[in-house]
Amino acid sequence: MTKIIFMGTPDFSTTVLEMLIAEHDVIAVVTQPDRPVGRKRVMTPPPVKKVAMKYDLPVYQPEKLSGSEELEQLLQLDVDLIVTAAFGQLLPESLLALPKLGAINVHASLLPKYRGGAPIHQAIIDGEQETGITIMYMVKKLDAGNIISQQAIKIEENDNVGTMHDKLSVLGADLLKETLPSIIEGTNESVPQDDTQATFASNIRREDERISWNKPGRQVFNQIRGLSPWPVAYTTMDDTNLKIYDAELVETNKINEPGTIIETTKKAIIVATNDNEAVAIKDMQLAGKKRMLAANYLSGAQNILVGKKLI
């Protein structure tokens, strides 16, 4: 069986790892260190580590791979192939050169579009109607290696980061399973990326999460979809942060002051943007409160919201 080092961290990576364990010989798993999670800051292993532990696989968790003791240990292994999926670190050249068949990456976009750490988020934020999976050879430059295989998938109007993450995770494992035999047999072909067409999807920053209502409704709607259910777009109402998990677009008869609550219904808080498409907030969370449907919030506040300004 093909001896593989797998490198990945979040839930997206676990589907790929499970497939590799079933089909090949995974001799080591490399992932990020355990991190404190939640209000109580409980040290929690990354999802990939949990899968590796279930199968009693050796796990390496360097804070930074380059120059680490873990790297030296990995370089001693007899390995055929390195597979990465959302690992979160660049690989040093010494590790890229180690496996006989090279190092490949499962990336959640149609490269060269959306190189970087947040391709699913950015595709939705930008209003793309499709994205996909790319299997590519790894090089020193980020997400710039030759493309081995690609498969596209449609982004539906009601998709958000959560739903697309789950679809792409399955697609990534399936496409890798189809692609690996030709890589192992040495019969695959690969094509260089056109660097002139490259776009980038950097990790989401806190400032990217704040909603600017002085934009077209479609842009605000896509921002909400593209950040839900994590890290979640937010605005401010009465000096209190308000996270918005779900919304929809509604037509308005006139353009109102952006950010103004122009109407409430039984199920939504309708907020003006800078065009005639308003955003109807349906699922929300006020700072310090539990997440709730707008309908539940409105049962006690419907009559006092119209005219308020979100900033």
UniProtKB/Swiss-Prot annotation:
Per the record's keyword annotation, is Transferase included, yes or no? yes
For this protein, the record's Pfam families field holds: Formyl_trans_C (PF02911), Formyl_trans_N (PF00551)
- In terms of superkingdom, the source organism counts as Bacteria
InterPro entries assigned to the protein according to its UniProt record, in alphabetical order: Fmt, Formyl_trans_C, Formyl_trans_C_sf, Formyl_transf_N, Formyl_transf_N_sf, Formyl_transferase-like_C_sf, GART_AS, Met-tRNA-FMT_C
Q: Does the keyword Phosphoprotein apply?
A: no
Key words, A-Z: Protein biosynthesis, Transferase
**Catalytic reactions of this protein:** L-methionyl-tRNA(fMet) + (6R)-10-formyltetrahydrofolate = N-formyl-L-methionyl-tRNA(fMet) + (6S)-5,6,7,8-tetrahydrofolate + H(+)
* EC code(s) of this entry: 2.1.2.9
Question: What GO MF terms are annotated?
Answer: methionyl-tRNA formyltransferase activity
Purpose of the protein: Attaches a formyl group to the free amino group of methionyl-tRNA(fMet). The formyl group appears to play a dual role in the initiator identity of N-formylmethionyl-tRNA by promoting its recognition by IF2 and preventing the misappropriation of this tRNA by the elongation apparatus.
Protein family per UniProt:
Belongs to the Fmt family.
Q: Which PANTHER family match?
A: METHIONYL-TRNA FORMYLTRANSFERASE, METHIONYL-TRNA FORMYLTRANSFERASE, MITOCHONDRIAL
Protein name according to UniProt:
Methionyl-tRNA formyltransferase
Q: What is the lineage of its organism?
A: Bacteria, Bacillati, Bacillota, Bacilli, Bacillales
